[in-house]
């Protein structure tokens, strides 16, 4: 592979995995793009190279190839290097994630006797049919890396708490740390996803966490909406759900697919009612401190007493200017969160849970119903990145049917106002 930018770190991870399994693969990182020195580039290529895939993070409509691809082809021609097959691919357009599975797909394509000259990765392109088929990839992260994922609501403090958590782990242990944060366009009141990694080896994973050792859902509506939260958990991992439900009530809200996944993959399931606890302590809607404390207890990154003390020190530093009452409230929340969760015994019957038949009750103009069904509903379920290109046929110029916002009822509030006319 010849590439530049963050995909090089992903490729390195995959190369380490493949070479350990006897494959002969490699990577040339382009660090200085202009001037493009052809003799230096060709000198960096081993004599044994037979095939090259050049990855560009851009699209040149009307061109016979993207810029880096054209430079590589030209460099080989100018320097007289023959017998090398060169193909070009695009990745990362529209902020698409590029996980290891995409890099595995590129090397699989190169193994073919006649690889396609142009391709894309990271999206299912069933219109021009340029995308490479991807299969679930093995975990290529450094051994011992712990991966965590937190689903929060914009404004609930989840992102801030996770920034504090990663600082505590990085400052007070010998572990390497990494954090990425995803937001939707709504900011406050929208979905936030925090991706945390920490481990004893350097972390070269510039992509989102796909399968996590620990997953926390900080808003119960995400469970009823059947967000892909449960399938984020690795087999044997832990799932913490913040809700006001009892274990019996939780069973009513989990989908059949979620129940089967939890039971079949030995997921440790925990419930915590940080919503009522925060109100009781006086924190209002801010559940982040309670949930952060529960995370440190369950994740066992460091001794519990140390983690609690470091969280209290951070809270004191953050809220000292707001007065002793605010600091004390946060300290109470930290102490409460460390023990407020309960483990749920997963019934054996969940392994055979069956989904109730779905009924569509969408009514309206045919073009609006088609948009809602094919685009808006998957996006609302946080499955938008899995949509194929064909889902957008008919909307190429950016025009959408009017009146579609009426179908977006998010229902993320824990409480709703009651009007009192008196």
What does each model-found stretch correspond to?
Residues 94-147, 327-422:
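Flexible inter-domain linker/hinge segments
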Residues 13-27, 78, 168-175:
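Short helix-loop-beta junction
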Residues 19, 26-96:
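C-terminal non-catalytic interaction/assembly regions of soluble proteins
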Residues 2-23, 36-41:
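Redox- and metal-dependent alpha/beta enzyme cores, enriched for Fe-S-associated oxidoreductases
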Residues 35-36, 48-51, 55-66, 142-154, ...:
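Active-site cofactor/cluster-binding pocket
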Residues 41, 162, 420-422:
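Extended, hydrophobic alpha-helical segments in both membrane/secreted and soluble proteins
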Residues 43-47, 98-108, 284-288:
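Short, surface-exposed amphipathic charged segments that create phosphate/polyanion-binding patches used
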């Amino acid at each position: 592979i010849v590439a530049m930018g963050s995909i090089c770190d992903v490729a390195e991870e995959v190369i380490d995995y493949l070479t350990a399994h006897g494959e002969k693969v490699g990577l040339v990182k382009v660090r200085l793009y202009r001037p493009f020195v052809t003799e230096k580039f060709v000198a960096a290529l081993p004599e044994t190279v037979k095939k090259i895939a050049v990855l560009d993070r851009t699209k040149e409509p009307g061109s016979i190839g993207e810029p880096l691809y054209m430079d590589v082809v030209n460099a080989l021609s100018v320097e007289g290097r023959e017998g090398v097959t060169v193909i070009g691919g695009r990745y990362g357009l529209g902020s698409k994630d590029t996980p290891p599975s995409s890099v595995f797909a590129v090397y699989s394509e190169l193994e073919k006797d006649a690889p396609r000259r142009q391709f894309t990765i990271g999206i299912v392109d069933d219109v021009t049919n340029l995308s490479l088929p991807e299969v679930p990839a093995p975990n290529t992260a450094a051994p011992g890396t712990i991966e965590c994922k937190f689903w929060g609501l914009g404004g609930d403090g989840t992102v801030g708490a996770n920034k504090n958590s990663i600082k505590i782990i990085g400052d007070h242990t010998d572990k390497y740390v990494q954090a990425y944060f995803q937001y939707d366009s709504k900011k406050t009141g929208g979905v936030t996803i925090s991706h945390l990694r920490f481990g004893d080896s350097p972390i070269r994973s510039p992509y989102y966490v796909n399968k996590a050792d620990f997953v926390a859902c900080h808003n119960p509506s995400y469970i009823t909406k059947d967000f892909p939260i449960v399938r984020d958990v690795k087999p044997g991992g832990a799932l913490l759900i913040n809700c006001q439900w009892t274990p019996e009530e939780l069973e009513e809200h989990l989908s059949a697919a979620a129940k089967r996944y939890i039971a079949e993959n030995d997921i440790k399931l925990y419930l915590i009612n940080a919503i009522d606890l925060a109100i009781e302590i006086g924190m209002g809607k801010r559940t982040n401190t309670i949930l952060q404390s529960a995370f440190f207890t369950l994740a066992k990154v460091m001794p519990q007493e140390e983690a609690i003390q470091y969280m209290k020190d951070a809270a004191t530093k953050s809220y000292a200017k707001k007065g002793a009452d605010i600091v004390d409230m946060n300290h109470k929340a930290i102490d409460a969160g460390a023990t407020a969760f309960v483990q749920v015994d997963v019934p054996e019957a969940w392994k055979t849970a069956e989904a109730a038949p779905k009924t569509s009750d969408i009514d309206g103009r045919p073009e609006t119903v088609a948009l809602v069904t094919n685009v808006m509903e998957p996006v609302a379920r946080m499955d938008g990145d899995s949509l194929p290109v064909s889902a957008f046929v008919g909307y190429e110029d950016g025009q959408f049917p009017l009146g579609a916002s009426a179908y977006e009822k998010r229902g993320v509030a824990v409480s709703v106002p009651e009007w009192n006319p008196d």
